């Protein structure tokens, strides 16, 4: 028969194993949701030429023009539709950006491409997206591309807010919930495992 001390040690061991099992299950569910989130999201990445007031203002003007284009023409039924439309309209993105810059008296190269790239955690109105690799439409303005970047969500939400726009409750919960341990865990794991190299998919 087990002594009281041995019984206490056994109960503590069983409790530890139970908590470890629950923690592993929770961690796996967060990683699975984060992976699904990345698969259901199309992002926008605009790189300015420099940090000068002129170039940063130009970047924001291009942003507004691109958002107007996507609001008007981009299908929003699914991420797959949005991605296919973006890949087919990269020249249109470039033309829109060049016309916007020309209206400001700026003549500089613009390159649009579809990439898979690593994003840090970003906060948006009503929610946030965890760090990880996402597909994105990227616009490079100029040749130096040394200025501050601008990120947002093209689908879902068209850069307004991603909150509530996903198919599953778990995805919406991860995006729209409070920035707590679950985000920290996803960030920590992606920091260890996610490659940082950009992969050009089109353009």
Tell where the protein language model's regions lie, with residue ranges:
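Short, Lys/Arg-rich N-terminal segment immediately upstream of the first membrane anchor
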Residues: 1-6
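Hydrophobic membrane-insertion alpha-helices, especially the h-region
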Residues: 8-25
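Aromatic-capped interface at the extracytoplasmic side
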Residues: 24-37
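Early exported N-terminus immediately downstream of N-terminal targeting peptides
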Residues: 40-87
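Structured segments of extracytoplasmic/periplasmic soluble domains
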Residues: 49, 65-76, 92, 96-107, ...
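Mid-length scaffold segments of soluble, non-membrane domains
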Residues: 80-147
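Soluble extracytoplasmic domains of inner/organellar membrane proteins
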Residues: 127-181
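C-terminal partner/receptor-binding element of secreted or periplasmic proteins
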Residues: 169-203
């Amino acid at each position: 028969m087990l002594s009281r001390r041995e019984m206490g040690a056994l109960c503590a061991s069983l409790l530890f194993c139970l908590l470890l099992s629950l923690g592993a299950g929770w961690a796996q569910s967060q990683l699975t949701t984060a992976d699904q989130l990345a698969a259901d999201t199309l992002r926008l990445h605009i790189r300015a030429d420099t940090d000068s007031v002129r170039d940063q203002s130009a970047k924001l003007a291009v942003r507004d023009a691109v958002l107007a284009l996507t609001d008007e023409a981009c299908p929003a039924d699914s991420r797959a539709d949005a991605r296919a439309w973006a890949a087919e309209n990269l020249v249109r993105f470039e033309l829109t950006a060049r016309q916007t810059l020309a209206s400001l008296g700026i003549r500089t190269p613009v390159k649009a491409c579809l990439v898979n790239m690593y994003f840090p955690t970003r906060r948006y109105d009503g929610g946030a997206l965890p760090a990880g690799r996402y597909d994105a439409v990227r616009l490079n303005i100029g040749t130096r591309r040394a200025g501050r970047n601008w990120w947002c969500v093209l689908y879902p939400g068209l850069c307004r807010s991603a909150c509530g726009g996903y198919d599953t409750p778990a995805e919406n919960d991860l995006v729209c919930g409070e920035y707590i341990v679950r985000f920290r865990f996803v960030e920590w794991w992606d920091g260890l495992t996610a490659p940082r190299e950009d992969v050009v998919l089109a353009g």
